[in-house]
Amino acid sequence: MRGLQPAHRHLPDYRIILVAFRGRPASGTGHVAAELGAHRGDHTQDVVGAAARSLPGVKRRRGVRRGDAEFQRRFDVSRTVAREVAKSLETAKVVTVRRRIGLVSQPVEEWDALSTQVIHWKLHSTHRKEQLRALTELRLAIEPAAAISAARYAPIDVKSRLPLLAAEFRHTGENGRLDEFHKLDIEFHSLILRNSGNEMLASLSTIIATVLSGRVELHMYPQKPKPEALDAHDAVAQAIWQSSPNNARQAMHRIVDEVAETLQLS
């Protein structure tokens, strides 16, 4: 397999971000060690994440060719791992496979936007702010709707659990137990989505969990939770418990609006 080659030689401004996979970090991509450390998971997924975040697709260009052997050399992994990396990148639409050419990188806008892997990679790249904006807009679209549906259709045991969860959420936040606080936040939002009575909304719970955990990893939560955020979680829980769809929608909207304000996206 030959080294990396631009498929569009006529583009003078085209730059290969990962130079021949020989370990020289390009501007804006960071060192490989930092890239590997950014993704939590087994070694194969570490390599997948590092490879994806350093592809020329991040620069919105298409066309760098590479193969398994290059992944082996670049990341010092076995052929089996290299093939798994290539397959994962193809599944996420980060690359396409072309006969007699190999793997060809794709522009970032063609990646699988709803893949939790892709979301994670973008959050740890130079696309962080636009990814956070897109995800916050997604949350504004789906979470108030999920709160409405949960108020109508969630089982009684789930409805009764939410006020207790919100109280625990407040207690851990006010007492600085942030690790527990963040876990409860993920549980709270996931529980509402999964019990909305809408399988489409339920399927997005893993995406919202990825968003919330990503904010923790990136240190984008305030060290002291805002009282209005705690109040809004209480209000959502009470509205769903009382089967009040409109109040649930309004309170959930306040939660996501507060997130946008905190992240300076609004």
Language-model segments: which ranges?
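Cationic, low-complexity basic patches in intrinsically disordered or flexible, solvent-exposed regions
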Residues: 6
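Short linear motifs at protein or domain termini
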Residues: 9-16, 20, 30-141, 148
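C-terminal all-alpha effector/ligand-binding and dimerization domain
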Residues: 11-14, 39, 166, 170, ...
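Amphipathic alpha-helical repeat elements characteristic of tetratricopeptide repeat
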Residues: 45, 129, 140, 160-163, ...
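Hydrophobic, amphipathic alpha-helical faces that serve as interaction scaffolds
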Residues: 111-114, 120, 126-127, 138-157, ...
